[in-house]
Every structure is written in C-alpha cells, then in structure tokens.
Amino acid sequence: MPAKPYAPSHIGSVASTYTSMRIAGAVKDSLVDLVCEELDRLVPLMEVATLDNDAERKTLDDAQRTRLNYNRTRELMIDRIKHVESVGSAAVQGGIEHLEKFLGRLMRHCEEAASRDRVSTIKPRHLEIALHSMGKG
C-alpha cells in the first residue's frame, strides 16, 4: 500500500513560511502534486548516488552531505528536555540544522585563526580563538 500524500493544509502551512501572501486552496492542492513529483525525480537520483558511494548500502542516504545522526540527536535532545514529555521530528530536524550551522560557523572561525598562523591544520589553540571570537570562550 503506497504512502498517503501530504495533506494540502500541511503543505500550505510549510509553504506559507516562504511567503507573506495567502495561498489559495487550489494552489495548496497543486503544491501537493508538485512536491510528490519532485520526490519522484529526487529519490531515484539519491538512490543512484547512495549506491555509488556504497554498493552494499540498504538505506537511502544523502550522498551530497554528511549530516548529524537523526536518532542520536533526538536522544541527546530527549536527555535535555525538562518541561515537555517528548521531542517531535520537526524539533529534531530543526535541532540538526541549528547544530550544523553552529558547527559550520565554528569551523569558519577556526579556519580564519589557522590561516592567520599560516598553517593548514586546525589546532586546539585555533578552536580556543574561534570560541572566544564567537563569545563562547
């Protein structure tokens, strides 16, 4: 049995974060079809890229980037919650995006510090400088 498509209201809610205009119901219906068509195009490409990277792999992966592990991030978030009972998938995805941006920003600062020293290896002193410049050290 194939998966149910997205609900137009859900797609409309997500799409509304990219515009300040209202979205007509018929447009929301069309967006569901368009998103599913984009998945029809995307998934086979991702399958090929996944198997090109690892022919034995059984799970679809994003070969274009390495992401923080979803389950590990979720578990770490659950360990830290105090006022709610669980962590939803949107929160995990948002957390991963936030952490990856943080890591990217931190690495850029580390690179700058290493470049000033005219070295090609990020060392602990460069991390300290980066953290200090970000107000975290």
Where in this protein do the model-derived segments appear?
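Intrinsically disordered, low-complexity terminal regions
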Residues: 1-137
